[in-house]
Amino acid sequence: MTAQHGFQATMTAQPGKADELIKLLLDAPSLPHDDCLVFLVSRSASNPDVVHVIEGWTSAEAHSAFFGGEQAQALVAKLQPLLTGESTYTDAVPVGGKATL
């Protein structure tokens, strides 16, 4: 399987809430989902409150279907109180690379 759809999110946690945000993301229901091929959570090297998520999915439809479901919406609801400012979300078209976690 190859990732045909990419998704990137950058979020800023409320002061002192980044670890909680990261824990929720690393327990995300998308991790065991068969159509989610890449799910990478990282913290900014220059601002520990900024958290990045990079995802690779088998298709845009699979990503959309998953995030329209109850599990994903429940996760989003848990994340919202931990965030401050405007988060950025970007859809992407993967062209290659490597991931070993």
State where each predicted segment sits:
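Short, surface-exposed ligand-recognition loops at beta-strand->loop->(often short) alpha-helix junctions
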Residues: 10-22
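Glycine-rich beta-strand-turn "strand-cap" elements at beta-sheet edges
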Residues: 1-5, 38-49, 75-101
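Intrinsically disordered, low-complexity acidic/polar segments
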Residues: 18-20, 50, 62, 98
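Short, well-ordered beta-strand segments in beta-rich or mixed alpha/beta enzyme
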Residues: 5-11, 40-67
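An amphipathic, aromatic/His-enriched active-site/gating alpha helix that lines ligand/cofactor pockets
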Residues: 27-38, 56-90
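Non-catalytic surface loops within mature trypsin-like serine protease
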Residues: 13-15, 59, 93-96
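Alpha-helical structural elements of signaling/regulatory helical domains
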Residues: 16-17, 34, 45
